């Protein structure tokens, strides 16, 4: 990034007789300089940002796929539990015909227990998916803001030198003096 900035600054030292050059007077060309800096940031930053987002998207998709695989495992357990429930129901009906009320109670308890287990499995699956999505969204946001801040600091450090800094301070002091004279 510093080489790109240096190449633009070196254009300002060319003679203006029949050639292209940049005016480095910050007060006279502030919109032009800002548009050039923004153009360079957008040009070089969009590739990095799109790569970052693509990588993050792949990670998110992989995590979602893993969560779906866990969900498939939960569905398999659910099917086993349903099969067991059907078996217990069949056995309970046979014992009911024979008049065993204790078996009826066990059937009811097993059905209730299985139903509670199935409901808990479904709730756990949904909670896991929701938690993973929130965690991934938070990580993407944190990484995006961190990289944006690092790029902005790097750009400012590479573009700001002592002379420019002193001229900006002097101009701001002059504006404050003018404002004070107007208010007095």
Curated annotation (Swiss-Prot):
Relay the record's extra comment.
Answer: In plastids the F-type ATPase is also known as CF(1)CF(0).
Spell out the subcellular localization from the entry. Plastid, Chloroplast thylakoid membrane
Query: What's the stated role of this polypeptide?
Result: F(1)F(0) ATP synthase produces ATP from ADP in the presence of a proton or sodium gradient. F-type ATPases consist of two structural domains, F(1) containing the extramembraneous catalytic core and F(0) containing the membrane proton channel, linked together by a central stalk and a peripheral stalk. During catalysis, ATP synthesis in the catalytic domain of F(1) is coupled via a rotary mechanism of the central stalk subunits to proton translocation.
Membrane-crossing residue ranges in chain numbering: 27-49
* Assembly with partners or alone: F-type ATPases have 2 components, F(1) - the catalytic core - and F(0) - the membrane proton channel. F(1) has five subunits: alpha(3), beta(3), gamma(1), delta(1), epsilon(1). F(0) has four main subunits: a(1), b(1), b'(1) and c(10-14). The alpha and beta chains form an alternating ring which encloses part of the gamma chain. F(1) is attached to F(0) by a central stalk formed by the gamma and epsilon chains, while a peripheral stalk is formed by the delta, b and b' chains.
- Write out the similarity annotation: Belongs to the ATPase B chain family.
Protein name per the record = ATP synthase subunit b, chloroplastic
UniProt superkingdom:
Eukaryota
Which GO molecular function entries does the Swiss-Prot or TrEMBL record give?
proton-transporting ATP synthase activity, rotational mechanism
Keyword field contains Amino-acid biosynthesis: no
One cellular-component annotation, GO: proton-transporting ATP synthase complex
How does the entry describe its membrane topology?
Answer: Single-pass membrane protein
The record, for Pfam families, names: ATP-synt_B
Which keywords label this protein? ATP synthesis, CF(0), Chloroplast, Hydrogen ion transport, Ion transport, Membrane, Plastid, Thylakoid, Transmembrane, Transmembrane helix, Transport
The answer on whether this UniProt entry bears the keyword Plastid reads: yes
Lineage here is: Eukaryota, Viridiplantae, Streptophyta, Embryophyta, Tracheophyta
